[in-house]
Amino acid sequence: MANKQALRELQSRLAERLQVARTQARGQSWLAVECSGRGFLLPLREAGEIFALAPILPVPHSHRWFAGVANLRGHLHGVVDLAGFLGVKATSASHEPAGREQSRLVGFNQTLDINCTLMVDRLSGLRSEEEVTADADDGVQRPAFVGVRYRDAAGRPWQELKLSELASDEAFLKIVG
């Protein structure tokens, strides 16, 4: 019970910080999320509402990474398992709410015009340009939605994912497998 209360308080603080960060015109800022132990940065300007993990109805004949659809505030949203889509999913993970108390669904900003959420293992707060350092470009060709790789003060890597590019990525939009 205490964990649920602490989680609600964290989510409330994150929502407040998210609102403050969106109104500030300072440099780049991100929502930090984790999937299969890896850190990802989602640009705040492109991220939308954060939802608790809701019941997900599977969609037949779709890719494994497309978890299904969920009713979120009275609207149907596609649910993409981010780790599965990126190919970094741990084999034991499932789409079932049991055992995924920290999992969240992160929506896309309404301006991106896509009724979809990304299922992540947990939220890791907010990050700003001042808190991370960009890694040198290794020259490897990556999809357009994969942005700069950063490191925080502890040396942990964080990969930026451009949601605006992801929302128009052909592989992401093709859920039928």
What are these regions (language model features)?
Residues 1-177:
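An acidic, low-aromatic, low-complexity terminal/linker signal
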